[in-house]
Amino acid sequence: MMNEMLNWIETNPLSATWIGLFLFFVAVFVRDISQKKHTIQRNFPIVGRLRYFLEMIGPELRQYWVANDKEERPFDRTERSWIYATAKGQNNNFGFGTTEIQYEPGYPIIKHRAFPYPESKAYVHNGDPSCIPCLKIIGPKRKFPYRPYSIVNISAMSFGSLGKNAVLALNRGARDSGAYHNTGEGGLSHYHMEGADIVWQIGTGYFGARDHSGKFNLDVLKEKVGKNACVKMIEIKLSQGAKPGKGGILPAKKVNAEIAAIRHVEEGKDCISPNSHSEFTNVKELVQFIERIANGTGLPVGIKSAVGEIEFWQELAEEMKQTSQGPDFITIDGGEGGTGAAPLTYADHVSLPFKIGFQRVYTLFQKEGISERIVWIGSGKLGFPDRAVVAIAMGCDLINIAREAMLSIGCIQAQKCHTDHCPAGVATQNWWLQRGVDPELKGKRAAKYIQGFRKELLSLAHSCGYEHPGQFTGQDIEISMGMNRYQTLEGLLGYKRDEVKFTKLQDYTVFPKRQA
């Protein structure tokens, strides 16, 4: 009988196909109408499946066909296009005037000068017209002080959250552009060793600097820092803008032998970052921990935090004033930050936005008279020249970028970072998807983005009569308060940033060397 059926199928292929399709849809119909998990499928068998398919591809449909250039979040199409064009070395100019609503509340206007700084006089350091060194030395009293070559740098993103090719590309981009590369709390990996300056971030899990019980081990940290002269600073992560006050977990399926070895954790088990540090529980202990690491490694040590309660910052400023100890730099992460997967409420409602958070912390340290001795770093959607200028005018010495750097190496804002199914291969450990990121090519694009960013910052500074963007003040920015109402940034925020000593750009291109 089987032979007869096969012969019939062979002689009647079209009829067999239709019968096969009919039986397939009958099976799907029976399954849909009998299952209880999905209401729509149960009530509308077969047809109801279209809803879930359209829901699945909805973000892509909206991104490419539905949304206009200014609608999407967190980065709209115009912003992404600027990053992509800059990273590829293409024309990143826009024609036919602005599409922005310049009277919209909060809109910044940068005030140019009638007599700009002559670009013909601009100093070019070692053939790099985009060189913008930090005007301050970080940790001048430490054994190995550090002056960043670039005021635009790559923020904390861990290997584990990002794939190895993405980390390689970012590190090569940082190397070629002179930026530093923050490891993220996942610790220092060999993918960070492509030649860029490194900021080693230490989070609540103390990954890569812990013993077998999970406790922080200074000797392990000292040994690794001693062997790797590329490590220039240590950053203690208190919190991040995406999910402040909440820990994290790298699922067991992602914890392969390589990640386990880098983080000093067990392979095949969930890798947990607690929501609080075990090495300190108050401000005094935090300052002592900072000094312990700084004295042990000789490196500048700072902290990264989103801003919530202000009492912590007041106590920290007072402790630093009394003891002349504490962080050499402070990274303020705005609530706009978003490289970490987070519960929706945390992403939307926990921690203050950058401008408000930075203003509250900075003014506290000004009142205590110690703001000038700290290097201030801003992060949280600051990867565009206009936003960077505002942050600098508020008091930032450096800018850290994360998602914008991801976009420069191919991220398409699919917002699937938390699923391990990043279609661009950036935020995934899937070996097949990762192959889409070529470290050599994407590294060059990351470098071009950072260099293009800095060139535009320099151009804006020159237009406003300055040689270096660090000279911007709150008087150079006006903020729209509605129709026909503008106020200076300085007047709006209620403070004047510290004046940073500046002579000429060339004087700040001497960089202290650290040898292993």
What are these regions (language model features)?
Residues 272-434:
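Glycine-rich phosphate/ribose-binding loops and adjacent secondary-structure elements
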Residues 164, 168, 177, 219-223, ...:
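Internal alpha/beta core interface subdomains
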Residues 227-251, 310, 315-332:
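Carboxylate/His-rich catalytic cores and anion/metal-binding grooves
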Residues 2-175, 179-196, 200-212, 216-242, ...:
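Conserved, well-structured core domains of diverse proteins
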Residues 200, 206-208, 252-281, 340-355, ...:
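Glycine-rich tight-turn/loop motif centered on a GG-T
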